[in-house]
């Protein structure tokens, strides 16, 4: 063999480079793995929203001045599983169309219907709105066994004692005879019910106006609004609670 003749590579009789094995390819993920992760995330998020805590926003001025339109709040759902609401607490509850006998007859809906309506972006679609699927936010003013009196201006007495409500700034207008556009109220609260009013007494559709009666059943309460997280300059705990009636 000539010294200048190229030698074949060792182990290759043809003189070509040996074939190297391809590196192992990572196994391809099944599309089901991705969708399973998405579904699991959604299930956890919906479970937290359904049973623990959820965010709500203020759509109207019924709780002015303490709660402004478009305020964002956190509502926790654990407190009232073991106790009744306390006076002064701000509660979120299902619309009276869901429990008021007169209104229920006009706006019937099933639980699945409200579940769909309350999903993000779906409830805003034209034709899907249902008053029975709405939620309201008001303040608890009277508890089971108490006699509540509300005069035409919106001032409250509990068992004959005036209720100190520093959060109320806007009472209903009344004339020289004490009459006005707002309804008065005089009733004894039954067990497992409360009476709720908006802080803006002149512009709140609350217990005073429900056609089937002024009482909110405890089991219709969604939760307690306890924290405002928007706007950022107003972040903080909600209050104040009304002092006890003596």
Regions found by a protein language model. Name each.
Residues 2-36, 47, 51-57, 62-246:
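Soluble "head" domains of membrane/secretory-pathway proteins
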């Amino acid at each position: 063999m000539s010294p200048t003749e190229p030698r074949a590579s060792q182990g290759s009789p043809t003189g070509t480079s040996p074939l190297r094995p391809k590196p192992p390819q990572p196994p391809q993920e099944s599309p089901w793995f991705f969708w399973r992760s998405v579904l699991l995330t959604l299930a956890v998020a919906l479970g937290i929203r359904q049973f623990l805590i959820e965010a709500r926003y203020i759509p109207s001025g019924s709780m002015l001045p303490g709660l402004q339109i478009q305020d964002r709040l956190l509502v926790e759902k654990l407190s009232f599983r073991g106790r009744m609401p306390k006076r002064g607490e701000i509660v979120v509850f299902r619309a009276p169309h869901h429990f008021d006998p007169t209104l229920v007859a006009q706006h019937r809906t099933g639980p699945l219907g409200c579940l769909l309506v309350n999903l993000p972006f779906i409830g805003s679609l034209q034709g899907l709105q249902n008053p029975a699927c709405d939620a309201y936010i008001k303040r608890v003013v009277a508890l089971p066994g108490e006699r509540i009196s509300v005069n035409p201006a919106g001032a409250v007495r509990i068992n004959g004692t005036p209720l100190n409500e520093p959060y109320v700034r806007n009472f209903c207008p009344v004339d020289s005879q004490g009459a006005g556009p707002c309804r008065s109220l005089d009733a004894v609260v039954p067990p497992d019910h409360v009476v709720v009013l908006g802080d803006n007494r002149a512009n709140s559709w609350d217990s005073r106006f429900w056609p089937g009666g002024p009482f909110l059943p405890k089991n219709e309460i969604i939760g307690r609004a306890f924290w405002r997280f928007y706007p950022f300059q107003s972040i903080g705990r909600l209050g104040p609670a009304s002092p006890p009636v003596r």
